[in-house]
Swiss-Prot record:
Organism: Mus musculus
EC number(s) per entry: 1.3.1.72
TM regions (residue ranges): 32-52
First and last residue of the signal peptide: 1-22
Domain of life per record: Eukaryota
Cofactor(s), names only, from the UniProt record: FAD
Associated pathway: Steroid biosynthesis; cholesterol biosynthesis
GO cellular component: endoplasmic reticulum; endoplasmic reticulum membrane; Golgi membrane; nucleus
Chief subcellular location: endoplasmic reticulum
Top-tier EC class: oxidoreductase
Protein name: Delta(24)-sterol reductase
Compartments reported by the entry: Endoplasmic reticulum membrane; Golgi apparatus membrane
UniProt-listed Pfam families: FAD_binding_4
GO molecular function terms attached to this record: Delta24(24-1) sterol reductase activity; Delta24-sterol reductase activity; enzyme binding; FAD binding; oxidoreductase activity, acting on the CH-CH group of donors, NAD or NADP as acceptor; peptide antigen binding
Length: 516
């Protein structure tokens, strides 16, 4: 009884403090209090609910039957929109705060919202090595199911809450992408509802133009209702090597060399300054040396990026065996390194042991509760960007990141970009090795001004035939955007499929003016 009374007294005192200081003051200056007391427990409840729901639905095998009914319901909504005169564009009815992007699309308030309640794994076919899923299936769901039966996705992007739909309509990448490409490159079929309410299935050999145009289109060619994705046999552990490297030239040379070695299942780099990095290479294995086993995903363990930094500080190489699912979600608990700005003591051993089992808070709930003042502060004093540049331009790109934003750590993830039709492809006719440079945090450059600094960075990326991930703030104008992306197939299909009066152009959904 006494703990309950103490908790009630603490809650009452907190509410009185909020009343005196004001909710906005607390959310901005002591946000960790609000996050720890409210968002962490709420996030845990969300996770438990969705995990239990997904398990029950899959065990009852009810998803395929429900799927057909839900698809018919989406078609009905689209046809009703047409019958009512097609007065506004359509978009999915999923609230903007539920997405992993830091911004919320303004268009949700003005467009016709089509409700798409598709969040289940439909089928796992181990003979064909295919998993068929609905668009709102998360990476957490996928790993929980596939890893338990000895399978995995060739490319399994990091954060638990990333969805299949977002990774196809936007993009997705992981440390295995040097072998398999982006998330779109492991997909074998898409099922969509088009602007006229019709259903279409597209593959590399059937409706191939649409198949190659869908990735990066952000839902502006149709509504994704299912996808078929390759699966491969999984092993229990990742044998991960850590190697600190100093000097930018040595870093780029080592990273490129390891990315070209296809015997590496995983390649990743964390850059802690312009000339200090730890490069990690891994292979899947069923064998383990017990003394080197590290269950890094356990709630009481140090955050992964801090653990990696120790190899740099002590200037030693290392070898560890990490459980496969722990490896896949190694950056989830700390949201890469963003959580250190929200809960500054989050990596403290005492906090980890007492409350680490509730971490991380849902990104969606962080967005929902941030408020207008905090949103503006984040916009001007916080950067979240992923720029994809050719590997040969890596050194030049890192100098540009240093000069324009100066954010560390920086995430380095290699990927092979095939020469295929669509919005994103290499400049030449052959596949090319690229690197994703991810910068997340507070810029340290003097007199940082978000718009001018980001436009300068975007200009550099265009000049080397690179690409910007579309979840991030985009300051390019329309002409610059279509200089970066190849819109030839995309515009052809928008006209051919009647999308011009049904969906906004992709630029109008992702540009800075379209989000808040």
């Amino acid at each position: 009884m006494e703990p309950a009374v103490s908790l009630a007294v603490c809650a009452l005192l907190f509410l009185l403090w909020v009343r005196v200081k004001g909710l906005e003051f607390v959310l901005i200056h002591q946000r960790w209090v609000f996050v720890c007391l409210f968002l962490l427990p709420l996030s845990l409840i969300f996770d438990i609910y969705y995990y239990v729901r997904a398990w029950v639905v899959f065990k009852l095998s009810s998803a395929p039957r429900l799927h057909e009914q839900r698809v018919r319901d989406i078609q009905k909504q689209v046809r009703e929109w047409k019958e009512q005169g097609s007065k506004t564009f359509m978009c999915t009815g999923r609230p903007g705060w539920l997405t992993v992007s830091l911004r919320v699309g303004k268009y949700k308030k003005t467009h016709k919202n089509i409700m798409i309640n598709l969040m289940d794994i439909l089928e796992v076919d181990t003979k064909k090595q295919i998993v068929r899923v609905e668009p709102l299936v998360s990476m957490g769901q996928v790993t929980a199911l596939l890893n338990s039966i000895g399978w995995t996705l060739p490319v399994l992007p990091e954060l638990d809450d990333l969805t299949v739909g977002g990774l196809i309509m936007g993009t997705g990448i992981e440390s295995s992408s040097h072998k398999y490409g982006l998330f779109q490159h492991i997909c074998t079929a898409y099922e969509l509802i088009l602007a006229d309410g019709s259903f279409v299935r597209c593959t590399p050999s059937e409706n191939s133009d649409l198949f190659y145009a869908v990735p990066w289109s952000c839902g502006t060619l149709g509504f994704l209702v299912a996808a078929e994705i390759r699966i491969i046999p999984a092993k229990k552990y990742v044998k991960l090597r850590f190697e600190p490297v100093r000097g930018l030239e040595a870093i780029c040379e080592k990273f490129t060399r390891e990315s070209q070695r296809l015997e590496n299942h995983f390649v990743e780099g964390l850059l802690y300054s312009l000339d200090e990095a730890v490069i990690m290479t891994g292979v899947m294995t069923d064998d383990v040396e017990p003394s080197k086993l590290n269950s890094i995903g356990s709630y009481y363990k140090p955050w992964f990026f801090k653990h990696v930094e120790n190899y740099l500080k002590t200037n030693r190489e290392g070898l560890e065996y990490i459980p496969l699912r722990h490896y896949y979600h190694r950056h989830t608990r700390s949201i890469f390194w963003e959580l250190q700005d929200i809960i500054p003591f989050g990596n403290n051993p005492i906090f980890r042991y007492l409350f680490g089992w509730m971490v991380p808070p849902k990104i969606s709930l962080l967005k929902l509760t941030q408020g207008e003042t905090l949103r503006k502060l984040y916009e001007q004093h916080h950067v979240v960007q992923d720029m994809l540049v050719p590997m040969k331009c890596m050194s030049q790109a890192l100098h540009t990141f240093q000069n324009d934003i100066h954010v560390y750590p920086i995430w380095l993830c290699p990927f092979i970009l095939p020469s295929q039709p669509g919005l994103v492809h290499p400049k030449g006719d052959e596949a090319e090795l690229y690197v994703d440079i991810g910068a997340y945090g507070e810029p340290r450059v003097k007199h940082f001004e978000a718009r001018s600094c980001m436009r300068q960075l975007e200009k550099f990326v265009r000049s080397v035939h690179g690409f910007q991930m579309l979840y991030a703030d985009c300051y390019m104008n329309r002409e610059e955007f279509w200089e970066m992306f190849d819109g030839s197939l995309y515009h052809k299909l928008r006209k051919q499929l009647g999308c011009q009066d049904a969906f906004p152009e992709v630029y109008d959904k992702i540009c800075k003016a379209a989000r808040h």
